[in-house]
C-alpha cells in the first residue's frame, strides 16, 4: 500500500523483461500486425505444403495453425536422429512429438521473428538428412 501511494512497485520489477517486451512491441508496430499475420500464414502454408508432399499432416487442415505445424511421420524415420543431425550441423532445433507421439510426429515452429527463408532453409536441411 505504501509503495502504491508513492507510485512505486511493491517489488523490484524485472527490467530485462520489460525492455524485451518493449523491443518486441516496437518491432511488431513497425512491421504492422497485418504483415505479421500474413508472414505467419505464408510460413505455415510453406511448412504444411512441405509436410503434405513428404509425410503427412498430423491434424486435419481445418485445425492447422500458422504458428506450428505437426508433421505425421508416415515414412517411419527415426525423428530423434534427424533432429540431432540438424541441430549439430546447423545449430537449429525442431521438436519431436510428446510421449506416445515422440517418433510418430515432429513439430516445425514458424512464428515470432522467423522468416520464410529460414523456414525453407530448415526444410531443406531436413530433406538433406532424409537422403
Describe every region a protein language model picked out.
Residues 62-69, 99-107:
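Small/polar glycine-rich anion-binding or flexible loop at a beta-alpha turn
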Residues 11-14, 72, 112:
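Hydrophobic alpha-helical scaffolding
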Amino acid at each position: 500500500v505504501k509503495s502504491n501511494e508513492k507510485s512505486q512497485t511493491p517489488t523490484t520489477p524485472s527490467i530485462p523483461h520489460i525492455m524485451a517486451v518493449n523491443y518486441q512491441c516496437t518491432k511488431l508496430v513497425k512491421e504492422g500486425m497485418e504483415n505479421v499475420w500474413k508472414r505467419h500464414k505464408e510460413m505455415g502454408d510453406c511448412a504444411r505444403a512441405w509436410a503434405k508432399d513428404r509425410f503427412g499432416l498430423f491434424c486435419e487442415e481445418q485445425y492447422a495453425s500458422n504458428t506450428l505445424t505437426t508433421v505425421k511421420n508416415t515414412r517411419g524415420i527415426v525423428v530423434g536422429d534427424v533432429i540431432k543431425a540438424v541441430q549439430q550441423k546447423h545449430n537449429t532445433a525442431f521438436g519431436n512429438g510428446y510421449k506416445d507421439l515422440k517418433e510418430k510426429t515432429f513439430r516445425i515452429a514458424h512464428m515470432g521473428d522467423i522468416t520464410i527463408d529460414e523456414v525453407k532453409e530448415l526444410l531443406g536441411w531436413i530433406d538433406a538428412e532424409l537422403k
